[in-house]
Regions:
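Carbohydrate-associated surface elements
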Residues: 40, 149, 169
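Nucleotide-activated donor-binding/catalytic signature segment of Leloir-type glycosyltransferases, i.e.
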Residues: 230-251
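A conserved mid-protein helix/loop that constitutes part of the nucleotide-sugar donor-binding site
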Residues: 19, 23, 185, 189-211, ...
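Short alpha-helical donor nucleotide-sugar binding micro-motif in glycosyltransferases
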Residues: 250-251, 258-263
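Membrane-proximal helix-turn-helix segments that form the acceptor-binding/catalytic region
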Residues: 99, 112, 125-143, 157
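Aromatic "clamp/platform" in nucleotide-sugar-dependent glycosyltransferases that forms part
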Residues: 271-272
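Acidic anion/phosphate-binding donor-loop and adjacent secondary structure
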Residues: 155, 165-184
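N-terminal subdomain of nucleotide-sugar transferases
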Residues: 1-43, 48-50, 253
Length: 272
């Protein structure tokens, strides 16, 4: 079996979708002939058990289309799997594939959750829905949800009822249990730094509880837009808790698991 996965970015700063593609390829690539198609970025991750192809972005429409069609012709996949929504490249690769009668699976990765749709609703989401995104959802052969809650929200949208739930996997072989449960007074947030993650809620909550958290260290780990990170840092200063919170940037591999083991509490506030 041959499968093409299209994903707009496999850069490490893209967070969960990049990690998903890495973990998926580790196992799926053992079972099928797997090809991943994406675009050039500054810090692409290494993905094993597959062939990675880079094509031009939407800004080079003709070149992008030509190279995508070339790959379809060369690989002749049984399934084309589109990852993510709202970016024109996702809808275009789907459209070009379906014009040649390829079967499409669309994985929104939470990008059709209510909070995401409401964000920039009139300026971005409505134009995208009218131009391409609604049609892409309707015409996909299957939508892939990762949880029942996501499926329920996709059904509420009402564009496509062919939805299958497949949870995201995690590689557990290299994860070891904590050797000590001694309290270290460390709280951890670890994810992509993005407004949808609700980090401001965490910061505001810490400000309310700062008298009870005097000896605690709150680590906020992850990469994201520098302007937004600076906004969050400024918020900690305004609330008088800058000395409680440490922004430590992106962490990966063993360093990530080390932070989890050292933390007494992991917090992931989110809008979706």
């Amino acid at each position: 079996m041959k499968i093409i996965h299209y994903i707009p970015s496999i850069d490490r700063t893209s967070g969960g979708t990049t990690a998903y593609m890495q973990l998926l390829a580790n196992e799926l690539g053992k079972l099928v002939e797997l090809n991943i198609v994406s675009h050039v970025s500054n810090n692409p991750v290494n993905i094993g058990n597959c062939q990675v192809h880079y094509i031009p972005t939407f800004n080079q429409y003709r070149k992008m289309k030509r190279q995508w069609l070339f790959l379809l012709n060369e690989i002749n996949p049984d399934i084309v799997h589109i990852n993510c929504c709202w970016m024109p490249g996702c809808a275009l690769t789907q459209k070009w594939s379906q014009e040649l009668n390829y079967k499409i699976v669309l994985t929104p990765h939470g990008m059709l959750e209510p909070w995401i749709i409401k964000r920039h609703y009139w300026t971005r989401k409505i134009p995208a829905l009218l131009l391409y995104q609604k049609n892409a959802i309707i015409k996909a052969n299957y939508l892939h949800a990762t949880a029942n809650s996501e499926k329920e929200n996709l059904l509420k949208i009402g564009y496509n009822k062919n939805i299958e739930i497949i949870a995201n996997g995690i590689e557990i072989e290299k994860i070891t249990l904590k050797t000590s449960w001694k309290r270290r007074k460390k709280i951890l947030f670890l994810s992509r730094i993005h407004v949808k993650k609700g980090i401001n809620f965490l910061i505001e909550s810490i400000a309310l509880l700062k008298n009870d958290l005097k000896d605690y260290v709150i680590n906020i780990a992850g990469e994201g837009d520098e302007n937004y990170i600076n906004e969050l840092k400024q918020l900690t200063i305004q609330l008088g808790i800058a000395n409680y919170i440490h922004f430590i940037g992106g962490v990966y591999g063993e360093q990530k698991w080390k932070l989890f083991k050292e933390a007494d509490l992991f917090i992931l506030p989110t809008h979706s």
